[in-house]
C-alpha cells in the first residue's frame, strides 16, 4: 500500500486545500490528512483558529476521498510519521521555511520517504 500523508491547520477549508488533497490522493492509494489541534495552532501561530479542531476535521471528512483524518499536536511530526509509515509526504511550499526542519528532513531521507512540496 502506498500511503500519502499531508498535514496542516485547514482553518476554513478552501480551494487551495482541496486541490492539494486531491492531487495528494492521486499519488497513492491511501490518503491520511493530519489536522493540527487547536492548542498546537495557538502555541505555534500565536492565534486561535477560526474553526475548532472538530469542525476542521469534519470539513476534511466531508470531502469523501480522504481515507483517514488524524489530529496531531506536535509541530515535529516524526513520531506521527513513524506510526503511519507513509511512502510520500505532501506539504505546502511554506513547509521548509517554517520552524526548525533539519531533523524532519533527516528523518525523511533516512526513511526513504518522498517529500513533495506544493503540488
Regions found by a protein language model. Give the residues of each.
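Nucleotidyltransferase catalytic core that binds NTPs
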Residues: 1-119
